[in-house]
Amino acid sequence: QISGPSAAVMYWNQREKSRHTFMGEWTRSGDKYTRDADGYYHYCGRSDDMLKVSGIYVSPFEVEGALMTHEAVLEAAVVAHADTDQLIKPKAWVVLKPGLAASDALADQLKQHVKDKLAPYKYPRWLEFVAELPKTATGKIQRFKLRG
């Protein structure tokens, strides 16, 4: 929750959304942060983008960041995806650097790369190679199109 003189007070003509978002002087932003041992805050994404895998929250940004450290990856996006048992797991869309070709072997290598960087439950169970990620005019990834 946040508060301050620049915070909005309501959504225009959206009473129910306003009621759930604005509580007196406080605004429930939907942004998730962690605080490190030195007191610094680190942005982890939106609460509606967070994945709950095996009962533990996973930031898609964290998985994307791990994928981005691989030499073949130009861009990555991660969203929640249900497996055959309807359990939520990470699914990744990856744009490769120019001149590189997608393959099952590379997909397996990228999954292992994430396992080596993060806790094993965070690795993407599915990985799709795409030419580009869907984005807004300002360059933000349109995750809702990937969930679709």
Per-segment meaning from a language model:
Residues 4, 9-10, 17-20, 32-122, ...:
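AMP-binding/adenylate-forming catalytic core of the ANL superfamily
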Residues 127-130:
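General small-molecule cofactor/ligand-binding pocket signal
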